[in-house]
Amino acid sequence: MRTEALEMTPSTSLSNWMGTLIGYVQSARPDLTNRQMALLLVVYLVDGPHTVRGLASKLKVSKPVVTRALNTLGALGYLRRQKDESDLRNIFVERTPQGTAFLDEFSGLIDRTDRAAARQ
């Protein structure tokens, strides 16, 4: 078995992403999983309406996976579920002011990391 360290040429994208993640970990914001963050970004960046079924299809995961992520994101106030009054089997997923504020802050963190990297 090989034990020597693998060398990797750092890419700008990975270095910037690392800087963003370190800043996020150091913030007071709750840790989100990659699935939760992907779900949140789809709801905020892709025109809706969004349903649990549609989000599961978009992310290529099961509806229970989306439901678990929505439970967490809903408890944080980042997303809200609303029943479709015309078809009670459908659940719409909607944006919230808290979710908008979170993503604005996260976007700012990415921008600051990118600017810091550009100065180097």
Locations of regions flagged by a protein language model:
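Canonical helix-turn-helix DNA-binding module
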Residues: 49-91
